[in-house]
Amino acid sequence: MARLVPVPVGDSPTGAPYSPAVRFGPLLFVSGHFGTSPEFARRIEEARATGEPLPSMAELPFDEQVHQTMRNLQGTLAAAGASLDCILQATVYLRRQEDAGRFDAIYRTYFTSHFPARTRLQAGRLPFDTGVEIEAIAYVPGLAFEGAGAGSEESR
């Protein structure tokens, strides 16, 4: 029987209590990712340690946030043995709907074989005032559900 397996990508870059991704059989369930750079993650860690207000990403250029979000998503997928082209479905949250065109122009450059099914919506205020957050469901190439063989219900 398939079981839930955390993807070994380290702790959440924000220190929040969640796994960046978990695998169930060949499926990956990827938590919402945003443009957290190592420097921004360090600032979050320092703020939490000192009791200071958490930093905001609002001052970072939107295009930069999108590129960093996609790189973070790539890193998590790679840690599980997958790539962006393995994404089956993505949900994109934008702080401002006016950024949709710029988001789409950048997003499309990260895929080589197909575009995943996708929902894009305006979400109002996102964590750390980021302009974009993306969650995804993907698959790991070469993996099958445990117990799935010829004639089994899972292989049909």
Residue ranges and their predicted role:
Residues 1-71, 75-89, 94-156:
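N-terminal presequence-like segments and the immediate start of the first folded domain
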